[in-house]
Amino acid sequence: MWIGIISLFPEMFRAITDYGVTGRAVKNGLLSIQSWSPRDFTHDRHRTVDDRPYGGGPGMLMMVQPLRDAIHAAKAAAGEGAKVIYLSPQGRKLDQAGVSELATNQKLILVCGRYEGIDERVIQTEIDEEWSIGDYVLSGGELPAMTLIDSVSRFIPGVLGHEASATEDSFAEGLLDCPHYTRPEVLEGMEVPPVLLSGNHAEIRRWRLKQSLGRTWLRRPELLENLALTEEQARLLAEFKTEHAQQQHKHDGMA
């Protein structure tokens, strides 16, 4: 996968290119990242990249000409088929379904805004899609872009050590992940659930699915509203609710 970055601070993306899973993907040639700074397309000695908004108000906007020229340079490098994305609070909220959808693209160009944003006409003429990582304000689009790159790159074949990892992640099936345990078997009196030590793969799968359903019900119940549960999932969720109620009753009795 090829990803182009439009940013005033391209150095920030070393967090993606030099470290962790994405760093290995870049090193192994599975992910290619190039960046363009609008500052490199300015024509004044101050390398100005901001301008006042019409109508007044606080803050500045990114200057149109350097930004457009940077986008055009990225498009030229990408060739045909690159989707241009602007990271914006007004965009579609990124979720696992959206990540999976974006991962089907071989080429992406991510435009990172700064200041109060970018000219609406640039959005209309240069941007294919707007995406947001949440309903809150950040200083720029770099962190959302890195979030998008990290999540999308997990779907690139060969990036993860285990090919099933991406499909078993939290939200991969619309559910939160189940609890995980490693050594020691007993930690300050807290034991690993016996089923995970049993070697019975069918029971382990069943336990993990039940815990995943239960954790989603407890922490993000709205996610279940959009799911059509199978008979097995509905049965396991009912079991979890019963067990949870019993544990709560026992806990209340001891309090």
Curated annotation (Swiss-Prot):
GO cellular component, one term: cytosol
Location(s) in or outside the cell: Cytoplasm
Effect on the protein upon substituting residue 171 to A: Loss of activity
One Pfam family this sequence matches: tRNA_m1G_MT
Keywords: Cytoplasm, Methyltransferase, S-adenosyl-L-methionine, Transferase, tRNA processing
UniProt xrefs under InterPro entries: Alpha/beta_knot_MTases, tRNA_m1G_MeTrfase_C_sf, tRNA_m1G_MeTrfase_TrmD, tRNA_m1G_MTases_N, tRNA_MeTrfase_TRMD/TRM10
Annotated residues for binding of S-adenosyl-L-methionine: 86, 113, 133-138
Mutagenesis or variant effect for residue 119 to A: Loss of activity
Induction record: Part of the rpsP-rimM-trmD-rplS operon.
GO annotation (BP), single: tRNA methylation
Enzyme Commission (EC) number: 2.1.1.228
Protein family according to the UniProt entry: Belongs to the RNA methyltransferase TrmD family.
Subunit annotation: Homodimer.
Further remark: The specific activity of this enzyme increases only slightly with increased growth rate. This enzyme is present at ca. 80 molecules/genome.
Function: Specifically methylates guanosine-37 in various tRNAs.
NCBIfam families found in the cross-reference section: PRK00026.1, trmD
Protein name (database record): tRNA (guanine-N(1)-)-methyltransferase
